[in-house]
Every structure is written in structure tokens, then in C-alpha cells.
């Protein structure tokens, strides 16, 4: 388990102090994939560097598997860092070394014999899908292949924790999905704890179990991914979710919808099994409503599906609308009134 207790990171400059991380508390379960999402300057990259002590916190404790990182001796800290590996946005490969020799590099530093290092590297080459490219140089690889080398190198010392700092930000969408699938596979096979820093909610949705949203150095919202997508609380979180679901039904569009006195435009949010149920059919049959679908989308998460549906319909009175709303919410479909005639 990884625990962050009241973590603060402050930088002093000539003009002012910069509070990069502001009293953050987090608990990350062993064997889980935990995402931290935020816009540029939110403090997320600083936060991840505190986990392996590349940055030292101004105050607070980082505890990994029972060890308080800031209290370890230099030799114990070096050993701990071997078990907390990291991959980066721009790969950080050694351009004068082949794929195989990039992977053996941390093993050489750790004093592993050349034969064992080569054997372990060959196994990792196969694991990340680069068999046949062992003798290639980074300049001969695509972006996705470079990141696969970075992942293999990070796994060389058999870590228990893998930190991913914007690891897919430089990749195209298809390659991003391939790298995410690889991380899922590695996590399952090696029982890794993975912490992912990103500004892409798509990444969070695809593979994370839990997510923390950061703004101005603070964690402003956190929880299970499905819960955060279903019911985001903070405006920043709502923006991330809206962008990922391609929900562009804003007030300017809703103004184009002509409504009579008894008309409603509502947004229905659903997750899990509800995302694949014939909801419109249910509404028309159960509540005898003529439904006009204005917008809809469904996306897939690691644990199921999430989505929204924006519809227009007319009801005779407010009591019937409340009956409709209560019925759907009893089935775990949230109902939000966008506009009322």
C-alpha cells in the first residue's frame, strides 16, 4: 500500500513561494491502478516525484509498504527506489544503446551479472512485444516501441510499484490504447501497483480503479472511477468527464430546442448494466411518453460501461415528472433537468 499523509511541497523563488502540493492525503491499495488527473500546473507531476523521493516533501510522510520514505537511510532508499520504477512521457532512453542494452542498464547499475541481466532483458523484450527488435536503436523505433522499451527497463529490477508520468501523452490514440492494454497485462501478471499521472480522462477511464483530481496543488475529488464519472462533484472534474464523453450539449444548443409549457429536456446518466439496457423503450412503455433523443454517448471503463442520454418529452404535470424521476433514480439512473418549458 502507498500512503500520503498531509504532503506539502513548497518551492522558494526570489519573488515568491510556490505551493506545488498542498496538504495531500491519499491511500493507494496494493495491486491497484490509481490515476491522478489534472490540467497543467495542477501539481500532479510534482506529486508523483515525491513517491520515489526524486523530490523531497516540505512536510508530510510518504509510506510505501510500511516504510516511511523520508526516514530511510541512503542505502535503504536506493534499495527502495529499485522497487519503485518510473516511465516518462519522452521515454528517456539512451540513444547510443540498443533496445536490449537499454533494458540491461539498470541491472548493470544494480550489480547483476551480465548473463543474468541479458536473460532477464530478453524475457522483458518478449513481455512488451518487441521480440526481434533487440538490436535496434531508439532512432529506429516508433513512439509506441520506445515506450515499450521504457516499460521493460522499468521492470528490470522487478519493482512492486510502477509510476507513469504522462506516459501516453506523446502517443497517438491507437498507440495509447495499446500501451494501456500492455500496462493492464503487466499489472495482472506481476501484481504491480501502478500510479498514473495524466491530463487525459480517457486514460483514467480505460484502466484505472480509482482516481484523484488535482487543481492548484490540492486533491479536489477522489473515488472509484465509475463513481466519479457517474456523479462528478467539482467543476474541474465535470469538465474532464464532459470532454471525455464528448458531451457538448451546452446551453447554446439547448436554446435551439423549442419547448412547450409541459416539455422537459433532461440528461440521464447511467453506469454498469444500465448502460446497455433499452432505457428509451422502458420510458416510452412504462411512462407512456413520446421521447425525442437529442444526444447520447456510451464509453467503456475497466469495470463496465458509462454514458449519458439527453432527451426531450412532455408530461401533463409536475407530479408525473416526479414519478418519472423517482422511478429512474430507483434504478440508479440519475436525472438532471437541462431545460423546462
Swiss-Prot record:
Record bears the keyword Transport: yes
Catalysis: reaction(s): L-methionine(out) + ATP + H2O = L-methionine(in) + ADP + phosphate + H(+); D-methionine(out) + ATP + H2O = D-methionine(in) + ADP + phosphate + H(+)
Membrane topology according to the record: Peripheral membrane protein
Binding locations of ATP: 38-45
InterPro entries: AAA+_ATPase, ABC_transporter-like_ATP-bd, ABC_transporter-like_CS, ACT-like_dom_sf, MetN_ABC, MetN_ABC_transporter-like, NIL_domain, P-loop_NTPase
Keywords: Amino-acid transport, ATP-binding, Cell membrane, Membrane, Nucleotide-binding, Translocase, Transport
SUPFAM superfamilies: ACT-like (SSF55021), P-loop containing nucleoside triphosphate hydrolases (SSF52540)
A single MF term (Gene Ontology): ATP hydrolysis activity
Its EC number(s): 7.4.2.11
GO cellular component annotations of the record: plasma membrane
Gene3D superfamilies: 3.30.70.260, P-loop containing nucleotide triphosphate hydrolases
Domain spans labelled ABC transporter: 2-241
SMART domains (UniProt xref): AAA (SM00382), NIL (SM00930)
Pfam families attached to this UniProt entry: ABC_tran, NIL
Signal peptide: none
Cellular localisation: Cell membrane
Assembly information from the UniProt record: The complex is composed of two ATP-binding proteins (MetN), two transmembrane proteins (MetI) and a solute-binding protein (MetQ).
Family, per entry: Belongs to the ABC transporter superfamily. Methionine importer (TC 3.A.1.24) family.
Function (record text): Part of the ABC transporter complex MetNIQ involved in methionine import. Responsible for energy coupling to the transport system.
Protein name as it appears in the record: Methionine import ATP-binding protein MetN
Amino acid at each position: 500500500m502507498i500512503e500520503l499523509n498531509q504532503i506539502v511541497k513548497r518551492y522558494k523563488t526570489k519573488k515568491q513561494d510556490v505551493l506545488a502540493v498542498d496538504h495531500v492525503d491519499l491511500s493507494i491499495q496494493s495491486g491497484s491502478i490509481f490515476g491522478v488527473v489534472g490540467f497543467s500546473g495542477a501539481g500532479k507531476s510534482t506529486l508523483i516525484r515525491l513517491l520515489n523521493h526524486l523530490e523531497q516533501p516540505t512536510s508530510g510522510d510518504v509510506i510505501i509498504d510500511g516504510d516511511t520514505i523520508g526516514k530511510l537511510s541512503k542505502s535503504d532508499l536506493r534499495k527502495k527506489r529499485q522497487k519503485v520504477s518510473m516511465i516518462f512521457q519522452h521515454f528517456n532512453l539512451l540513444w547510443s544503446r540498443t533496445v536490449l542494452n537499454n533494458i540491461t542498464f539498470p541491472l548493470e547499475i544494480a550489480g547483476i551479472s551480465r548473463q543474468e541481466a541479458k536473460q532477464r532483458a530478453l524475457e522483458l523484450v518478449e513481455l512488451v512485444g518487441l521480440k526481434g527488435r533487440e538490436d535496434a536503436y531508439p532512432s529506429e523505433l516508433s513512439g509506441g516501441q520506445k515506450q515499450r522499451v521504457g516499460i521493460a527497463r522499468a521492470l528490470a529490477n522487478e519493482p512492486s510499484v510502477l509510476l507513469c508520468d504522462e506516459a501516453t501523452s506523446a502517443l497517438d490514440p491507437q498507440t495509447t490504447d495499446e500501451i494501456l492494454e500492455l500496462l493492464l497485462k503487466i499489472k495482472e501478471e506481476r501484481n504491480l501497483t501502478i500510479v498514473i499521472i495524466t491530463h487525459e480522462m480517457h486514460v483514467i477511464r480505460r484502466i484505472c480503479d480509482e482516481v484523484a483530481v488535482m487543481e492548484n496543488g490540492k486533491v479536489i475529488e477522489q473515488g472509484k472511477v465509475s463513481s466519479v464519472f457517474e456523479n462528478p462533484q467539482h467543476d474541474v472534474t465535470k469538465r474532464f468527464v464532459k470532454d471525455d464523453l464528448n458531451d457538448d450539449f451546452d446551453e447554446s444548443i439547448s436554446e435551439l430546442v423549442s419547448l412547450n409549457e409541459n416539455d422537459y429536456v433532461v440528461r440521464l446518466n447511467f453506469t454498469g448494466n444500465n448502460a446497455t439496457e433499452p432505457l428509451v423503450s422502458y420510458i416510452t412503455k412504462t411512462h407512456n411518453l413520446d421521447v425525442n433523443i437529442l444526444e447520447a454517448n456510451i464509453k467503456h471503463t475497466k469495470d463496465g460501461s458509462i454514458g449519458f442520454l439527453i432527451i426531450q418529452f412532455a408530461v401533463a404535470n409536475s407530479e408525473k415528472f416526479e414519478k418519472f424521476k423517482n422511478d429512474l433514480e430507483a434504478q440508479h439512473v440519475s436525472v438532471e433537468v437541462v431545460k423546462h418549458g
